[in-house]
């Protein structure tokens, strides 16, 4: 009987420890996602930013994460071994960087309309980083090669007038 009781006590201890660890560690893992509204889809009417939930401390982590994700998406385009096409180059580039675009749209609209010292500090810090980020994409020789292939073969693609115009100006 004693072994049976010890076994139950050990199981209860393990369950208690696991429960404690889960309850203690899970908020640490997900706290950034739960607290930063940029890291989730907007659950507002018309998907407008939830301005009442956004504060200045959300911007830098969202900008940094947005640039990281954007770089990953651009690297996927570069590493794509398929024959370059309008879809896998131009459309993929246009669709990339959605988090960065969302954060930038909110931040720069706020900085232009209701600025404060904290917003100005963030703007001063993030502007050169964004410039460098976008320059690294625009001046990337691998992206340039792929776009050049498309541009040189523009007449071989079945492009709409809009797609043709986009490619001509890329």
Indicate where each model-derived feature is located.
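Bacterial N-terminal signal peptides
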Residues: 16-27
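Zn2+-dependent metallopeptidase catalytic domains
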Residues: 31-170
């Amino acid at each position: 009987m004693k072994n049976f009781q010890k076994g139950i006590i050990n199981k209860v201890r393990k369950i208690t420890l696991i429960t404690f660890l889960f309850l203690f560690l899970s908020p640490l893992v997900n706290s950034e996602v739960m607290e930063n509204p940029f890291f989730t889809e907007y659950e507002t009417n018309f998907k407008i930013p939830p301005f009442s939930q956004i504060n200045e401390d959300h911007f830098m982590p969202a900008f940094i994460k947005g640039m990281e994700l954007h770089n990953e998406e651009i690297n996927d385009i570069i590493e794509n071994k398929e024959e370059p096409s309008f879809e896998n180059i131009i459309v993929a580039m246009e669709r990339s960087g959605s988090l960065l675009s969302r954060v930038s749209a909110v931040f720069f609209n706020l900085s232009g309309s209701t600025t404060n010292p904290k917003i100005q500090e963030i703007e001063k810090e993030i502007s050169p980083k964004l410039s460098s980020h976008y320059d690294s994409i625009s001046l990337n020789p691998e992206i340039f090669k792929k776009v050049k292939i498309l541009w040189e073969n523009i007449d071989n693609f079945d492009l709409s007038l809009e797609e043709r115009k986009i490619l001509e100006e890329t």
